[in-house]
Amino acid sequence: MLNLTERLEAKEQALHQVDRTKKYISGARKFLGEGKIGLAIERYDIAEDALESANYYRELLWKLSNDDPTQEEFEAICVVESMKIVLYKLAKDLSGK
């Protein structure tokens, strides 16, 4: 039973950190649009930290599921992975490339 509790907690934490990542990416994009590059970079850094935390919980969830996650767990894992692409695109926009 402990494993199921741990899996649920890992999934919830991963999704919570994804929500934080989205929040700070949104803030970074807002400031970037306003030409406030310094503030945009600060928000990017926070988003990057949140995504790093989400990735930790994604890896933990994968480990706890013994490489056989439920559909709901797999979707959470995929959300974390997709946020890596979103953050990468923001980094490109911040660098002007």
Where on the chain are the PLM-derived regions?
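Long, low-complexity or tandemly repetitive, helically biased scaffold regions used
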Residues: 2-97
